[in-house]
């Protein structure tokens, strides 16, 4: 994938607009997870070291084009300064004369954060005038928000049409990891795709089948495939209306030479609550009044054996209802084994999606995978094979501006 990075960029004295993703989880005004801030810090530090005047901007939450004080980026700018170890200014606007004055007063190496771009309706509408108003405060645009790349908004796509545009280091790392996962992977390559519904991951499964050698279907989604094969899944969550689709997917996988691996046993319970009585049974022997809530030990063993044969693993979705013990066991055991193989240099592991990242953190191995994407929606749309506007414009804008 051809896009320009910060390598060799002369940023000294230049106003560099950095589109970060500062949309961090907050509770009662306190940031509960600063991962996204930690991830964007290397790009900002590099630009500061190069003598740039760094102007950071981002969306936060969904204010729907209105000014909502509780959704201000002010507390996030403060936290970013603590992470970077230097003062970070804050401007209570993202366009207009106040911003122009603040940017005009910056010295080389200074950093400011602008107010939430979504306080303006022009952001989500990708209004060209709003994009121009953002762009006029920069000489260079650096997009370091892969997690917002699936949205064609003014701050992700519009600005890139008006300024020389580059991928930041986090964007570069995400794109390199994703390319290694599915575009040019070391084979054999496998994917763990979990979640509750086939209907929400149809495009994803269809795209992945074309690219992987082994597809592990896990979580409640597997129940639909099992039921479509005539297995009794008791009272388990499943989509009866998707049985024919599941059979078509299985047939397509066979045509493409992709092996689908389904659970062979399960941990079941009568209630979906913490620490309720459970039993383990083979698939096909699930009691009528029970629900499948986790993969069983034989399934874990089967997946571990298959992981031994792979060079690359893409992971999206847990193996069971991992949020509640003891239904986290299969997810934790497979995650820890994948991490062990990664540490031994035998497997490249690329994981993403909100539940997946939470599950890997729960298993204590989020930092031991080759790459864990914080992107959520953008990661899923990339897995679906969709064009991401924020990436596409980085490729085309350089050409438009004669900067290839």
Curated annotation (Swiss-Prot):
Signal peptide: none annotated. Substrate binds at residues 21-23, 36, 59-62, 118, 151. Its EC number is 2.7.2.3. It is found in: Cytoplasm. It is an enzyme of class 2 (transferase). Pathway: Carbohydrate degradation; glycolysis; pyruvate from D-glyceraldehyde 3-phosphate: step 2/5. Keywords: ATP-binding, Cytoplasm, Glycolysis, Kinase, Nucleotide-binding, Transferase. InterPro entries: Phosphoglycerate_kinase, Phosphoglycerate_kinase_CS, Phosphoglycerate_kinase_N, Phosphoglycerate_kinase_sf. It comes from the Bacteria. It catalyses: (2R)-3-phosphoglycerate + ATP = (2R)-3-phospho-glyceroyl phosphate + ADP. GO terms for molecular function: ADP binding; ATP binding; phosphoglycerate kinase activity. Pfam families: PGK. SUPFAM superfamilies: Phosphoglycerate kinase (SSF53748). GO terms for biological process: gluconeogenesis; glycolytic process. ATP binds at residues 201, 323, 353-356. Monomer. Belongs to the phosphoglycerate kinase family. This is Phosphoglycerate kinase. It comes from Gluconobacter oxydans (strain 621H) (Gluconobacter suboxydans).
